[in-house]
UniProtKB/Swiss-Prot annotation:
SUPFAM superfamilies per the UniProt record, alphabetical: Hook domain
Organism of origin: Mus musculus (Mouse)
GO biological process terms, semicolon-separated: apical constriction; cilium movement; cilium organization; cytoskeleton-dependent intracellular transport; microtubule bundle formation; mucociliary clearance; negative regulation of canonical Wnt signaling pathway; negative regulation of microtubule depolymerization
Gene3D superfamilies the UniProt entry points to: Calponin-like domain
Protein name (record): Protein Daple
Function, as annotated: Required for activation of guanine nucleotide-binding proteins (G-proteins) during non-canonical Wnt signaling. Binds to ligand-activated Wnt receptor FZD7, displacing DVL1 from the FZD7 receptor and leading to inhibition of canonical Wnt signaling. Acts as a non-receptor guanine nucleotide exchange factor by also binding to guanine nucleotide-binding protein G(i) alpha (Gi-alpha) subunits, leading to their activation.
Motif (GBA): 1652-1683
Gene designation: Ccdc88c
Biased composition (Basic and acidic residues): 1025-1036, 1410-1419, 1681-1697, 1866-1883
Bias type Low complexity, positions: 232-245, 1430-1439, 1510-1524, 1562-1581
Domain Calponin-homology (CH), chain residue ranges per copy: 11-131
Length: 2009
């Protein structure tokens, strides 16, 4: 038996349940045998301890800790355990234990049997079920997971037995459900039937057993009555009761009596209940129907409840996801910020790599130079000898040079004679020009004769000027040849200057590096501050923890007052989280301290590394100092270069590291900011309406950010669609969740009502009502959580959108996602368990209804405690999560620091390796340099032998070539070393062979070059000797012969130079080839570096993963330590409780004695009570019987009495009938018996009826209550439906809002796309125009250099220019005063409403240029014949064409000129400053009445200038002409009466002429002429310049036509200056009235006084200073100065020149060539551009004075009436074409232009807006807006040189459409300044009449297509007015900045304004202008920009500040 028991015990102890129990601490820890272990388990002490851990709720029952094999104590412990398990299952887990409970008696009496072991297994199984489902289930499951796999499987099977098997444990959670699915109902009903059967069977068995036992007891009691004594006699037979004492027998008798009484009661109740059952069955049948209906309602409610439960699960999962998403959001924000930084880092990396490459190259160069210098130091002795020989040769050359100087002096004398002759011719030409001007003033009546006369004079003058120019150029070429010979000797000295410049550059680099070091120091300081902030945050956390502790202490005190007797248990429970949290906080603080210390240590390491690097630098410096031997300056420079390269490499490494740390710190700061922002957004979401409004604002901001993102990251555009779809899906999910939440709310309300109804039913339990109220509070909390979840979901939706982007971009995020999914799975499991717990809590609430009042109170108190504990736990968890996040941040920082340290170590190793490699390379390079030097020496020796008399320049060149070859060798060597180190020797041999071959080739080429130079150098000696021989002959022919010989010699020198340059070019090409190879190798190196960087990133990711694992390990270890600490605390508490328990046991023992005494008394009393009760019952029965008998007897007595009386009365009768009565008596007695029986039955039935009626009333009450309950449910359902309908309405509203926001978002996206496309077009055109500007700047520089040669002419003409400039300045001051007066009347134009007109304009602007060009081509073909007139000399002159067109005024003019004419007439629509009344709705487009409206244009044009700015505001389009051009067109379409008011004839004799010239049509014509020709004029004759500007010479750039005031100003400036008419130009935007301008112009015509400008530009500038500044700054206008001697002659020559300069302001290029005054002579600005005819085209060629017809002609036939027959005759069409083709010559660009261009484009964009196109939207829907679009780019570039000087011109410029923008005409190529197609389309494009170029800007300047409607009625009226012709554009300066430069200013005309506009931009060109023109850019810009501030981009700003912001001279 012992063996079997031991085996059973072993098997039992090896079972998985026991192994699981062993995980609970001390059990089985000691070395005990199996039996003791088993007995310890059976005693129940340890199992009770486990149960205490599972269910820490206090219980009053004390466990017996010292069993000592006592059966009763063991049974007591086990019964306590089973009771606790049962209560825990029912109350906490909401489950019923259906299985038979473990038999405690069997375990206690016979623990070692197999059955008892099975019972113990049951106990362990139930304990396992509790442990797996309790609150600490995670901890217990973790313990189970640590066991073996087999034991785990066994435990899982046991758990399934408890949780899943309904036969063991029955789940009561379905009671919570209002209704259950039919399938589930079936399964439940089957289980219930099965359990019911089993329970009934068990009940029957128990009752039978009780009956048997009672019978046996009664029998025994009857057989053996209890003896009076305590002990029975020893002789008595042994019986079961004999052993019992008398007390026990009494006790048993009392119990038997109790059971009998109970049996009786039970039987009575059973009978009553059977009767009640029969009665209620009928009611049940009636209620079944109602129940079915209720069931259907319940089914629906159950489905809703199920969905609500599912949504609870989802809510929990969503909460977890929200927590997870917060983390992911933080990661996302970091990644986003890093993404933003990635582009910057990429650019920074590329820049640093480029800098590295440059530094490496410079290092290599310097090393080569060092080696070369060392070699040179070896050669010094030989070179000294050569130096002596060269000195002797130099002496000989100096003698030759002296002879050359004498010859040059003779030539200069001859040149002076020629210059004097030229000056005379200039004076004559000036006189002729004056005469022409006089004639033009007096020749209004006879147009044709006047034109022919002007043409003849211009032709004569131009022919003379051309001859003089040719002679001048020939002389200049000879002088240049002589100067080149003298400059050759000075080149060697320049090289030292270059080296010094390089040294300065290197010093600048050193300064930059020092600044970088300072930044690094700052970044280190920032890191220190960061660490301090972290410490502060840690302190804040500590303070927060202390506050939490204080709160907990307060809560503990409150709970102590409430729960006095439970104080110790609650205190122990609350101390645990405090201890744990404090320990965690301390650990985290330690970790943070460690991280901070590690960061500090790493920073110190970085500083140490920097110091080591500095030490390395110092060592390198010392080594460099040792290299000084010979040529100290060269060595010093080389050392500095080497030091710089080393410093750069070291500092770059350090800066990169510091920058990385800075960015990381910035990333952390940004993360903190993002978290704060996210908190703010969550708070904002709480209020839904405000949240929606803020969402709109946020969407707007997000749209802006998206636009920026679209510009910065275009590659994300494809992902946007996916993100939008995901966004919609998320919104749908959000809406579904909202619906679910609403359903949950309704369900919660229903549940509240049900609970209230249940409370009304169970009104007896008041304390249960409190518990139900607490449940309602919980439901409200759930509702709040649901609302919070809605807000969180919205935040999560945004976060998810960003997350999806980052998941696609980042690979590491995918791994994190997988890990997070696993966590989600675990969290979902936990969530399910929590849901089960919640269900159990609900079941507890329902079960408590059945429990007594005391238990309900205890449960409510326990619930309060649990809530407080939950709150505390939630707080602790929040704190723990925050601490965990801080830990993660800290670990990330530590990881980053470790990574930085590793990178530093790797960089150190790389530096060491690179140093070693550089040493090897330097040694190999030294060898190579020695070999090469040997080759160089041999070459030098050969050169000495072949060319003994070569100069030192050849040697320096050969040395440079050798250094270049050495550099190439080094590059090839480095490439080969990177590719293959093994083939190094082979590569070196190949390179040596190549170098030798190259040296041989160089030697051969140099020998040939030296021979050619010798051949060239010999003739000078001969020439000089010949000159000496012939110097004695005095004849002039000999001098000319000498000049011819000098020319021949120069030609020979040029040829030889060309041959040498070709050879040099070949060598450069070879060098470029080698450089390309070097670049390819460097790219390969970069790819390798990228691969290495990728591998490093991979390693970093792996390191981060390992770090994460370490962190997890550390967290687990910390948790383990915390659990062990908790266990120790619990043990100590247990020990204390055991001590208390022992004390209580003693008390219990004392109480037990008292209890036993009381029990005995109770037994006695019980027996007495039973006896009395039995007697009482018997008496009651007797009493009832007696009562019934008494009643019967009384009735009988009464009846008998009555009968007795009757019998006495009838005695006689009765006596007779006694026999009959005797028989009847017998019958009556029988009847009495039957009646007595019937009455008794009747009474019994009446009692039963009363009882049944009472039951019926009770059931009725219940039924009414149920009916009321159903009514309440229906009302609640109706209310919920109403709420649902309200929420649906709300949802529909929100949906509509969302759809509207989606529509607005799509609109914004479209707008963004339009802007991006427009930006791309603008950038393309800007790049194109930049290249053109560069070419123009180069040509301008060349021309300026040519102009500088003739300095004497400058001095002679300087006084005239200065006088005229002074007069103009004075005039400008007057104009400024009047303009400032006009500011008072400034009234900004009302803005239009339609913002989308700008968008339409944008769409049209984006149209391709080709369509516009085609349309313009069609329009040019459709234009009148004068437009495309062939170049036949026999063809009719433009004057004829003009006449023909003026004769037909009704025909609207076609081509671009129509636009300007329409400008003039449709003024009300074009909202320029001059059309205030038209803007306000004046219907008179071009009627005669317009004269009155614009009589005072100064007053009317000024206020309305913002309206004109609206033209320019579409800076994005920047296509429309300036604000001022429009007003004066529109304000004075007729111009007749208004011009009379605009002048003051009293002061000047020329006043009437001024007035007429200021008239509107003339200003229009002059504006056309100026716009088409002005800028080419202003180009100083550089046709190349104009052509290179390509389309940049838009009408805006070329004096756009809308502002005749400005046109007159710019067009006539130069002419006025020459003639003494200093008509002051109006402001660029034309704010000044023409009246004031003409008055001043007239006054200045006679006075000639020079006005002084108050602006800084009024300072006197000498002509030489002006030119020097222009040469230094690179004139942005690209105009090249030419000889000033032919200034006046150039005017006539320019008038005859074709518009090859791109349509210069001369009449031929103007739209209205006929409007040029004949008397006006533009200053000659010469250009050395040769046409195909061999003539040099001068800028002034186009400035032919044209005769201006009447204003009616100007209005009615601007394009048609070109009253310039002489001009058109002199304008050879072939010259037009050739000049346009020559316009492509390249020019150098000044450095300031690029910046000016960027500023211009920025200002244009700043000035833009949707309102910019408002005035133009009705004008020309198709073509014109598109035209403006293309012109923006051209104008922005045209204005780029202008912007360098002045900002305001840009607006005007931007406003005028580019010449190629009008859809009516061919795209105007500003290089040609005509509408003719480009030269690719036609070979003779410019064979038009002289008016063809005028058409060019006619289209462009007339940017306001409203002016199309030309009213011919105005023509006659206007024709009578203008009698004085205008000088339209005779200034050869760059196109004016202002678009509207009209000729309406009297004689000033376009020439003045034009030269002004150009001078503002090109100081270098002013020397060529007349003196009044040379007032400089300052004067004119001050005069113009200060007055035109309303049109400037910064209207409120000071014009002077605007001027100086862009830089004046």
């Amino acid at each position: 038996m012992d063996v079997t028991v031991s085996q059973l015990v072993e098997l039992f102890l090896q079972s998985p349940l026991v192994t699981w129990v062993k995980t609970f601490g001390s059990f089985g820890s000691g070395h005990q045998d199996n039996l003791t272990l088993y007995m310890d388990l059976v005693d129940g002490i340890f199992l009770n301890q486990i149960m205490l851990q599972i269910d820490p709720r206090p219980s009053n029952q004390r466990i017996n800790k010292h069993v000592n094999n006592d059966v009763n104590l063991r049974i007591q412990n086990l019964s306590i355990l089973v009771r606790n398990i049962k209560t825990y299952y029912q109350e906490v887990l909401q489950q019923l234990i259906v299985m038979n409970l473990p038999n405690v008696l069997m375990i206690g009496k016979d623990p070692l049997s197999g059955k008892s072991m099975e019972e113990i297994k049951k106990v362990l199984l139930l304990v396992l079920g509790c442990a797996v489902q309790c609150e600490r289930k995670e901890e217990f499951i973790e313990r189970i997971k640590q066991l073996d796999i087999e034991t785990q499987a066994g435990i899982v099977a046991h758990i399934q037995e408890v949780t899943h098997n309904q036969e063991n444990v029955f789940d009561l959670q379905w009671l919570d459900l209002p209704d259950v699915a039919p399938e589930e109902l079936e399964a439940l009903s089957r289980n219930m039937v099965f359990h019911l059967r089993r329970l009934i069977d068990e009940r029957d068995e128990c009752t039978e057993l009780i009956v048997d036992l009672t019978q046996e007891r009664d029998y025994l009691q009857t057989q053996q009555p209890p003896s009076p004594g305590k002990f029975s006699s020893p002789d008595s037979t042994p019986s079961p009761t004999s052993s019992l004492s008398s007390e026990d027998k009494q006790h048993l008798a009392v119990e038997l009596a109790d059971t009998k009484a109970r049996l009786r009661r039970v039987r009575q109740e059973l009978e009553e209940k059977t009767e009640q059952l029969a009665d209620t069955r009928h009611e049940v049948d009636q209620l079944v129907l109602e129940l079915q209906k209720a069931k259907q309602d319940n089914i629906q409610l159950a489905a809703d409840a199920r969905s609500a439960r599912a949504y609870r699960d989802e809510l929990d999962s969503l909460r977890e996801k929200a927590n997870r998403v917060e983390r992911l959001e933080m990661d996302l924000v970091r990644c986003k910020e890093k993404l933003h930084d990635v582009d910057f880092y990429k650019a920074r990396m590329e820049e640093l790599r480029e800098d590295n490459i440059i530094l490496i190259e410079t290092k290599a160069m310097l090393e080569e130079q060092l080696t070369a210098s060392r070699a040179r130091s070896d050669k010094v002795h030989e070179l000294e000898k050569e130096n002596l020989q060269l000195k002797s040769k130099l002496h000989d050359l100096e003698l030759d040079r002296d002879a050359d100087k004498k010859q040059i002096e003779k030539l200069l004398e001859e040149y002076m004679v020629l210059e004097m002759a030229q000056k005379q011719s200039m004076k004559e030409s000036a006189h002729l020009g004056w005469e022409l001007e006089q004639l033009s003033k007096n020749a209004d009546l006879s147009d044709a004769s006047r034109k022919s006369f002007v043409f003849e004079l211009n032709e004569c003058a131009s022919s003379r000027i051309l001859k003089l120019e040719k002679e001048n150029q020939s002389l200049q070429s000879t002088i240049q040849g002589l100067r080149d010979t003298s400059l050759a000797l000075e080149e060697s000295s320049l090289k030292y200057g270059e080296l010094e410049k390089e040294n300065q550059q290197l010093s600048k680099k050193i300064e930059k590096l020092q600044t970088q070091l300072e930044r690094e120091k700052q970044s280190n300081q920032d890191l220190e501050t960061l660490s301090e902030e972290l410490i502060r945050e840690k302190e804040q956390l500590q303070s927060g923890m202390e506050a939490l502790k204080a709160d907990r202490a307060r809560q503990i005190k409150d709970l102590e007052q409430e729960k006095g007797h439970l104080h110790q248990a609650v205190w122990s429970l609350r101390e645990r989280p405090q201890v744990n949290s404090t320990k965690d906080v301390e650990k985290e603080n330690r970790a943070l301290h460690q991280a901070v210390t590690e960061a500090g240590s790493k920073l110190s390491q970085l500083e140490l590394e920097k110091q080591q690097l500095h030490r390395d630098l110092e060592e390198a410096k010392e080594k460099g100092e040792q290299a000084e031997a010979l040529e100290k300056e060269l060595h010093r420079l080389e050392k500095e270069n080497e030091q710089l390269t080393k410093e750069v490499t070291s500092l770059k490494a350090a800066t990169e590291k510091v920058e990385a740390l800075e960015h990381q710190s910035q990333g952390l700061e940004l993360e903190n900011r993002s978290l704060r922002k996210s908190l703010d957004t969550l708070q904002n979401v709480s209020v839904q309406l405000e949240g929606l409004e803020r969402d709109k604002q946020q969407l707007g901001q997000e749209n802006l950010e998206l636009r920026k993102m679209v510009e910065a990251m275009r590659f994300t555009s494809a992902k946007m669609a996916q993100i939008e779809t995901e966004n919609r899906q998320l919104e749908r999910e959000k809406e579904e969740l909202r619906r679910d939440v609403e359903l949950l709310k309704t369900l919660s309300k229903k549940s509240e009502r049900l609970e209230l109804s249940y409370q009304s039913v169970s009104a007896e339990n008041l304390q249960l009502q409190h518990s139900l109220e607490s449940s309602t509070h919980k439901s409200q909390a759930l509702q709040r959580e649901l609302s919070q979840l809605e807000a969180e979901r919205q935040a999560l939706r945004r976060d998810l959108e960003t997350l999806q982007l980052t998941h696609k971009q980042l690979e590491g995020a995918e791994e994190d996602r997988k890990a997070l999914e696993q966590e989600v799975a675990q969290l979902e499991k936990d969530k399910k368990l929590l849901e089960k717990e919640a269900r159990r809590l609900w079941q507890q609430v329902e079960l408590k209804d059945a429990i007594l009042d005391d238990s309900a109170a205890k449960l409510s108190a326990a619930e309060k405690e649990s809530r407080a504990l939950d709150k505390e736990l939630a707080r602790c968890r929040d704190v723990g999560s925050k601490l965990k996040e801080l830990e993660k941040d800290n670990r990330d920082l530590t990881k980053q620091v470790t990574m930085h340290t590793r990178t530093l170590t790797t960089l150190r190793e790389d530096l060491v390796l690179e140093k070693l490699k550089s040493q090897q390379l330097s040694s190999e390079l030294d060898k190579l340099s020695q070999e090469l030097e040997k080759v160089g020496l041999s070459k030098d020796l050969l050169l000495q032998e072949d060319d003994g008399h070569g100069d030192g320049k050849g040697k320096t060149e050969s040395a440079l070539k050798t250094t270049l070859a050495m550099k190439e060798e080094k590059i090839v060597f480095l490439e080969a070393q990177v590719e293959e180190k093994e083939s190094l020797s082979r590569q070196l041999q190949i390179e040596l062979q190549m170098i030798k071959k190259e040296h041989e080739q160089l030697r051969q080429t140099q020998e040939g070059g030296d021979k050619a130079q010798n051949a060239l150098k010999r003739p000078p000696g001969k020439v000089t000797s010949h000159q000496e021989k012939e110097a004695w002959e005095p004849s002039h022919k000999e001098a000319t012969m000498e000049l011819l010989r000098v020319k021949d010699r120069a030609i020979e020198l040029e040829r030889s130079n060309a041959a040498l340059q070709a050879e040099r070019q070949l060598l450069k090409e070879q060098l470029q080839h080698l450089e390309t190879q070097n670049v390819s190798f460097s790219s390969q190196i970069l790819t390798l570096q990228k691969q290495s960087a990728f591998l490093q990133e991979h390693t970093t990711t792996l390191q981060t993963q390992t770090a994460k694992l370490q962190v997890e390990n550390s967290t687990l270890s910390s948790q383990n330590a915390a659990l062990s600490a908790q266990y120790t605390v619990l043990q100590s508490q247990q020990a204390a409780k055991e001590a208390e328990h022992e004390g209580l046991q003693q008390q219990q023992e004392q109480l037990a004695a008292v209890y036993e005494a009381l029990l005995q008394d109770h037994k006695h009393l019980g027996t007495l009570y039973e006896c009395q009760s039995s007697e009482y019952e018997a008496l009651i029965r007797q009493h009832s019987c007696l009562k019934t008998l008494h009643r019967n007897l009384e009735l009988e007595h009464k009846e008998l009495g009555e009968r007795h009386g009757d019998l006495q009365q009838r005695k006689a009768e009765l006596e007779e009938l006694e026999k009959v009565l005797s028989t009847e008596r017998e019958a009556l007695e029988r009847e009495q018996k039957t009646n007595a029986i019937a009455t008794s039955e009747n009474q019994r039935l009446r009692g039963e009826l009363d009882r049944i009626s009472f039951l019926h009333q009770q059931l009725k009450g219940e039924y009414e209550e149920l009916h009321a309950h159903t009514k309440e449910l229906k009302t609640s359902l109706n209310n919920s439906q109403l709420e649902l309908s309200r929420w649906q309405v709300r949802f529909d509203e929100l949906k509509e809002q969302h759809q509207s926001m989606d529509i607005s978002l799509t609109k914004m996206d479209n707008h963004c796309e339009l802007l991006s496309r427009l930006k791309g077009n603008l950038e393309e055109e800007n790049h194109h125009l930049l290249s053109q500007i560069q070419l123009l700047s180069q040509q301008n520089q060349m021309l300026l250099e040519q102009n500088m040669e003739s300095k004497e002419q400058y001095h002679e003409e300087q006084k005239q220019y200065i006088d005229k400039l002074n007069a103009l300045r004075r005039h400008k001051e007057k104009l400024e005063e009047k303009i400032m007066d006009q500011y008072k009347f400034y009234d900004p134009a009302p803005k239009k409403k339609n913002h989308w007109i700008g968008a339409k304009a944008l769409v049209k602007l984006i149209k391709p240029k080709k369509e516009g060009s085609r349309e313009r081509l069609k329009s040019t073909t459709d234009s009148p014949p004068w437009q495309l007139e062939p170049s036949d000399p026999a063809s009719p002159s433009p004057s004829q064409a003009l006449r023909s067109q003026t004769e037909n005024p009704d025909n609207p003019p076609s081509g671009p000129n129509c636009v300007e004419e329409r400008d003039t007439h449709n003024g009300p629509v074009g909202k320029g400053p001059g059309d205030l009344k038209p803007k306000r709705g004046s219907p008179r487009g071009g009627s005669v009445d317009r004269t009155d409206t614009s009589t005072d244009p100064a007053v009317k044009s000024w206020p309305s200038e913002p309206g004109s700015r609206t033209f320019s505001t579409s800076a994005t389009t920047a296509a429309l002409s300036s604000s001022t051009p429009i007003p004066k067109h529109l304000g004075r379409t007729k111009g007749c009466n208004s011009d009379d008011n605009l002048c003051e004839p009293s002061s000047e004799p020329d006043g009437p002429y001024h007035r007429q010239q200021a008239s509107r049509p003339n200003s229009l014509e002059s504006s056309r002429n100026a716009s088409s020709n002005s800028s080419p004029l202003s180009l100083k004759g550089s046709s190349d310049h104009l052509h290179s500007r390509c389309e940049s010479f838009s009408s805006a750039d070329l004096i756009p036509s809308r502002d005749p005031a400005t046109l007159s100003r710019d067009g006539n400036t130069s002419g006025r200056g020459l003639l003494g008419r200093h008509e002051y130009p109006p402001p660029r935007n034309g704010p000044v009235s023409q009246e004031t301008i003409q008055k001043k112009g007239a006054a200045s015509t006679h006075t000639g006084v020079r006005p002084h400008s108050a602006s800084p530009s009024s300072e006197m500038v000498t002509l030489e200073e002006f030119l020097e500044e222009s040469n230094r700054g690179g004139s942005p206008t690209h105009d090249t100065p030419s000889c000033r001697d032919d200034l006046l002659s150039d005017y006539f020559r320019k008038a005859h020149d074709p518009p090859a300069l791109g349509g210069q302001p001369g009449p031929p290029a103007r739209k209205d060539g006929a409007k040029m005054p004949t008397s006006f002579v533009a200053p000659t600005i010469k250009m050395s551009i040769n046409t195909s005819e061999g003539q040099q085209l001068k800028p002034g060629h186009y400035v032919k004075p044209n005769l201006r017809p009447s204003e009616a002609e100007a209005l009615a036939g601007m394009p048609s009436r070109q009253v310039q027959p002489p001009q058109s005759l002199s304008l050879g069409r072939p010259r037009q074409t050739t000049m346009t083709q020559n316009c492509h010559m390249p020019v150098s660009r000044s450095a300031s232009l690029s910046r000016a261009f960027s500023l211009a484009s920025a200002d244009l964009l700043r000035a833009s807006g949707p309102e910019a196109c408002r005035p133009e939207s009705p004008q020309k829907p198709g073509g014109h807006e598109a035209a403006g679009a293309r012109e923006t780019s051209t104008h922005s570039l045209q204005g780029s040189h202008i912007l360098a000087r002045e900002r305001t011109p840009i607006v005007g410029k931007a406003d005028s459409p580019s010449p190629g923008q009008g859809t009516r005409g061919r795209p105007l190529d500003t290089r040609r300044f005509s509408l003719a197609p480009p030269k690719e389309e036609r070979l003779a494009p410019l064979q038009q009449s002289a008016t063809a170029p005028a058409l060019a800007t006619g289209c462009s300047s007339g940017s306001n297509p409203q002016i199309q409607h030309f009213s011919p009625t105005v023509a006659p009226a206007v024709r009578t007015k203008s009698k004085v012709p205008q000088h339209s554009g005779e200034v050869a300066t760059v196109a004016p900045v202002r678009p509207g430069l009209g000729t309406s200013e009297g004689d000033g005309g376009p020439g003045h304004g034009y030269s002004e506009g150009l001078l503002t931009k090109s100081p270098g060109r002013s020397s060529d202008l007349p003196p009044h023109v040379k007032r400089g850019p300052d004067d004119f810009s001050q005069g113009s920009s200060s007055k035109s501030t309303p049109a400037s981009p910064e209207p409120g700003g000071d014009p002077q500040t605007v001027w100086y912001e862009y830089g004046c001279v």
